[in-house]
Amino acid sequence: MSAVASSAPSATTSSVMTSEVSVCNKALRYLGAPEIVALDQPSREADLCARYYAEARDELLECHHWNFATRYTSLAPLAAVPPFGFAWAYRLPGDCLRVRRLRDSQPFEVVEARTLYTDAAPAEAVLTVRVTDPARFPALFVEALARRLAAALAVPLMNSTRLEQSMLQRFGDALDAARVADAAEGASDPVELNPWLTAR
């Protein structure tokens, strides 16, 4: 089996040419697996990358208050009267992954059907949103995403729990570096990791 790559980017590495395929190929190189030219090509590597990429991306976006994925917005009110003693109900945007806070730290609760309950009116929120354009990802975020994707691919593609554990460990290191660099550019809120990020 090919040796697992160990190189990591610097914080200043450009991500201008980053694409979904390039992130997937970075993960495949870490596993010593063949690279792909498209996510819809007829190969097991492409099929598995297409299956796991979006899930890995969204989970990674959720686990930290990334500056590049932050949106400040006024939520749209709903006509429905909320239960649980809250005065107002609001609709969350379709690309919202996590509500970080409301203005003036007003209490809130997020429930099913992408609805937020609160007493605040209007509800001005800080959100983490889904970013689908990889060209917007900082270089260290790309590194963490590739490591996490490599961990997800290790067993179904390479049949190797050893590689999976190695990639999870390196993912943890890459995530720490990405968080530190992101925090240096603005305030961030630490968030508990989703279990999917730390174990299968």
Task: Cite the ranges covered by each PLM segment.
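Short secondary-structure subsegments characteristic of cysteine-rich extracellular domains
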Residues: 42-60, 163-179
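Internal mixed-charge
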Residues: 11, 15, 22-23, 103-200
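Divalent metal-cofactor coordination and adjacent catalytic microenvironments
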Residues: 47-115, 137-153, 157
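N-terminal start-of-chain detector that recognizes signal peptides
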Residues: 39-41, 96-100, 122
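Short alpha-helical scaffold segments that flank and stabilize functional sites
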Residues: 27-30, 59, 181
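Hydrophobic alpha-helical elements and their junctions with loops/disorder across both membrane
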Residues: 31-34, 63, 185
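Polar low-complexity intrinsically disordered regions enriched in Ser/Thr and small residues
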Residues: 35, 88, 186-189
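Short, extreme N-terminal leader segments that mark the start of a protein/domain
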Residues: 1-51, 199-200
